[in-house]
Amino acid sequence: MTPEVFMLCVFAALLVLDTTYAFQLTFSRGIIAAPLMSLITGDVMAGIQIGVFTELIFADVSPLGGILPPSAVVCSAVSLALNAMGIDLYFAFFFGVTGSILFSVAEKFMRKNRFKWLVFWERKILQKPNTVNRTVALALATSFLMNFILIFIFTWLCGKLMLTLLPYIPMKAHFACKFAYMAVPWIGLATLVPAFRLKAR
């Protein structure tokens, strides 16, 4: 695990806060987050590519009701981190997609359990109103720490696994993953066609 990958995980954990917990300035969108994170690894073109692919692959997932969409930040972070560790982008991206889906499941669980903490913090603020800033900062720090732990552990495990298996992966598997990776934008665009058709009517 290089310092660049570690810093990437830290930055990703901060960007995840932009989705719901703080600011909401759309920095957590894949098309923005991936190029920003790629500045850490030094491969901006890979960041732009991952950002576009992430936007397209999750284009038809809408955060409505109880649906929590996969995290574009996690997808981008895992993909770029694994690529920085020497894993081909066409392998890294699919680990990123898997990580983003698992992260959304974990986040849904954390949000359910966070309600108890919110009640506790609300009572604390009502008792001591002057502690509101400290309480909010503590809540954000807790969310950041949980995000970092989840992203770091998943990236580390995937990196170890792929670096171990990479010499034994046959060329046919490389070709299949390359083909699947290059099909991602077309699949994403295909999911948008019905949406545009409905808007046009």
Regions found by a protein language model. Name each.
Residues M1-A72:
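Hydrophobic transmembrane alpha-helices
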Residues L89-C158:
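Helix-loop-helix junctions within the multi-pass membrane cores of secondary transporters/permeases
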